[in-house]
């Protein structure tokens, strides 16, 4: 299993609305995508940004995605983002759909909160995705959650 994350800065709050619409329209295409376990479409309306966080069961499927039409369309719309490939070190997924998530290095201090903890093998940085209201890290709305 590998994780993948990228973040795209948006110019205006109108762009945030466009990303929400895009997530609602395109999100279902990712449901059941071969090799993909989960994809979270993330939106930060305060500091306008669009992000994604993927969990892939099959690394070859992640490569196919990055070389395929969906990622190409994203690059045409927003420019090519810096994609982080991450190694999951711990995973506790929420039982139900949650509306919010946070990204950051929480250093295992989330208690029983559902989270995916990852390690960037290039830099050694920890990048965690915590589900729910954390009060820590960068806060996001979950615009869509695609799953296998």
Q: Regions from the language model: what does each represent?
A:
Residues 70-79:
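A common structural junction motif
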Residues 1-37, 47, 61-66, 80-148:
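Short S/T/G/P-rich N-terminal loop/turn motif that feeds into the first structured element of a domain
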Residues 42-44:
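Short beta-strand micro-motifs enriched in acidic
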Residues 49-51:
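Short, surface-exposed coil-to-beta transition loops
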Residues 55-60:
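Long compositionally biased, domain-poor regions of proteins
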């Amino acid at each position: 299993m590998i994780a993948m994350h990228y973040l795209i800065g948006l110019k205006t709050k109108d762009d945030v609305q466009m990303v929400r619409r895009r997530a609602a329209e395109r999100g279902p295409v990712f449901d059941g995508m071969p090799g993909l376990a989960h994809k979270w479409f993330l939106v930060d309306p305060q500091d306008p940004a669009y992000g994604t966080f993927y969990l892939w069961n099959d690394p070859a499927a992640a490569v196919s995605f990055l070389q395929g039409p969906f990622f190409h369309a994203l690059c045409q719309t927003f420019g090519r983002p810096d994609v982080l490939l991450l190694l999951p070190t711990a995973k506790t997924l929420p039982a139900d759909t949650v509306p919010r998530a946070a990204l950051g290095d929480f250093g295992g201090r989330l208690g029983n909160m559902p989270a995916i903890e990852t390690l960037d093998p290039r830099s050694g940085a920890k990048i965690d995705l915590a589900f729910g209201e954390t009060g820590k890290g960068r806060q996001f709305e979950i615009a869509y959650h695609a799953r296998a």
